[in-house]
Amino acid sequence: MNLHEYQGKQLFAEYGLPVSEGYAAETPQAAVEAADRIGGTEWVVKCQVHAGGRGKAGGVKLVKNKDEIKAFAQKWLGQNLVTYQTDEAGQPVSKILVESCTDIAQELYLGAVVDRASRRVVFMASTEGGVEIETVAEETPEKILKAEIDPLVGAQPYQAREIAFKLGLKGVQIKQFTQIFMGLAKLFEEKDIALIEVNPLVIKDDGNLHCLDAKVAMDSNAAYRQPKLQEMHDPSQEDAREAQAAKWELNYVALDGNIGCMVNGAGLAMGTMDIVNLHGGSPANFLDVGGGATKERVAEAFKIILSDSNVAAVLVNIFGGIVRCDMIAEGIIGAVKEVGVTIPVVVRLEGTNAELGRDVLANSGLDIIAASSLTDAAKQVVKAAGGAA
């Protein structure tokens, strides 16, 4: 679950990290009032969306008077911001962050993520601040400094000092960096965070370190332990179908094709998309209904898939390991009747009672195509959707 920048900075402030004074505004007038509270003659206004690249898209601006603040808010509030990280529709802007202006002498990068390879939280830092860390990793990987956090003892000050020295920090900056490092580590653990990025972490003209940006993502699996962070959830930033799927514990990701895919198991779902592509088709989604594929969940999955107007055919690929294929077949039939599916549906069943499941589908009287194998299913659904792309 992603947080907005202003929410991330609220967390940073709770843990004693240096952030700019700023306020989120929902109206142009509130944005002007926020500038009055902050004071000064220059401010930075930022569109609050769950996407990077806001600056290049015009969603971040340095303003020098209240009229500019009002004009910026009027331009963006209620509109969608399109960046290189969003789709063509962009993300809706419902809040503007107004904060004090910060002088920048140098930009650094500091972040932390759960590294699956080492099975530990890994801190990363670089002198290449303000740049996507993926770009740095690809082009100049030697510029990324890392520190693995031992889960037994937690983050240690010496790890922060080692990185600070390598970043070229001196004197009081080393102490400040250590405080920021330890604060982020504490925040990461206590709030069940999956990703933190401070990009950029800046050295101001006076030599002090300052967190100029905040990207925070919480581990959604731990949301039940973090009720305060759950309150920060902004569903408007998510695909409506993905949000609906999450309510039914369905793993759904929208794609650009015209063949809807409903599968039980993430690995099988990816394999299904691959074989559809192999035979010239284009998947419209990734959808994993999981092990408990009940009639109700299958029906909801159909509704979500069919809410995409591009879908011309649906491929249901079920391996009956935990569940029986005949029960799944009955669920599919019930779902097709309930939802009123009018496009071709191809079903491939394998595993426990697979033959019985295919018989149930064949005798249903519905226009459901029972495939004999995964290859056959892929070929049939591609044909039903209009042929190879």
Swiss-Prot record:
Its cofactor is Mg(2+). One of its GO terms (molecular function) is succinate-CoA ligase (GDP-forming) activity. One of its GO terms (biological process) is tricarboxylic acid cycle. ATP binds at K46, G53, R54, G55, E99, T102, E107. Mg(2+) binds at N199, D213. Substrate binds at N264, G321, I322, V323. Keywords: ATP-binding, Ligase, Magnesium, Metal-binding, Nucleotide-binding, Tricarboxylic acid cycle. Pathway: Carbohydrate metabolism; tricarboxylic acid cycle; succinate from succinyl-CoA (ligase route): step 1/1. This is Succinate--CoA ligase [ADP-forming] subunit beta. It comes from Pseudoalteromonas atlantica (strain T6c / ATCC BAA-1087). The lineage of its organism: Bacteria, Pseudomonadati, Pseudomonadota, Gammaproteobacteria, Alteromonadales.
